[in-house]
Amino acid sequence: MSQIIHAKDLRPGNTFIYKNNLYLVIENSFNKTAMREGIVKCKVKNLRTSSITVEVLTGEKLERAIIDKVKAMYSYADKNTLVFMDGESFEQIEIDANKLKWEKNFIVDGSEVSILKYGEEVLNVSLPDQVSLLVDFAEEAVQGNTVQTAMKKARLETGLEIEVPQFIKTGEKIIVNTVDGKYVGRDK
């Protein structure tokens, strides 16, 4: 049932099992020298711990990990868990809030996400690249501060504080990049 993949055939985006851990390949390089087996260096992300490491593999046969993406909608937070509703079966999926420290900054009621699962094990939540969030509080603009792109601090509805342009006011909706948490633009 499980598929085997050779280390030299790994590509970015592939998932595999190595030393009882689930990995996602971020980058890889293959070096082959005369009369030696090829050496594969992979920058990988551990899907259980989210840590990023470099693994050196030499001619190993690895088990491919099949990761399922389940469309879900954020429902509510309960103590130390975030509760999502599966978009197809309508069952509730609970995820430990400590697993989603960064992702929590972009999740509000009704947010649509993809939940990454390996079998029945919930690994993580995949967010869209950009989300629309409400500005909860924005500092007042400073007049004459226009030598370069003038920025000020703003607190979003999730509690995340980011730098925004001077013209953004409290109560506006803005688009934020979920990868780096930076302001992208106004939401229309």
From Swiss-Prot:
One of its GO terms (molecular function) is translation elongation factor activity. Gene3D superfamilies: 2.30.30.30, Nucleic acid-binding proteins. Coiled coil: none annotated. PROSITE patterns: EFP. SUPFAM superfamilies: Nucleic acid-binding proteins, Translation proteins SH3-like domain. InterPro entries: Elong-fact-P_C, NA-bd_OB-fold, Rib_uL2_dom2, Transl_elong_fac_P/YeiP, Transl_elong_KOW-like, Transl_elong_P/YeiP_cen, Transl_elong_P/YeiP_CS, Transl_elongation_fac_P. Keywords: Cytoplasm, Elongation factor, Protein biosynthesis. It is found in: Cytoplasm. GO terms for cellular component: cytoplasm. Pathway: Protein biosynthesis; polypeptide chain elongation. Signal peptide: none annotated. GO terms for biological process: peptide biosynthetic process. It comes from the Bacteria. Belongs to the elongation factor P family. PANTHER family: ELONGATION FACTOR P, ELONGATION FACTOR P (EF-P) FAMILY PROTEIN. Involved in peptide bond synthesis. Stimulates efficient translation and peptide-bond synthesis on native or reconstituted 70S ribosomes in vitro. Probably functions indirectly by altering the affinity of the ribosome for aminoacyl-tRNA, thus increasing their reactivity as acceptors for peptidyl transferase. This is Elongation factor P. The lineage of its organism: Bacteria, Bacillati, Mycoplasmatota, Mycoplasmoidales, Mycoplasmoidaceae.
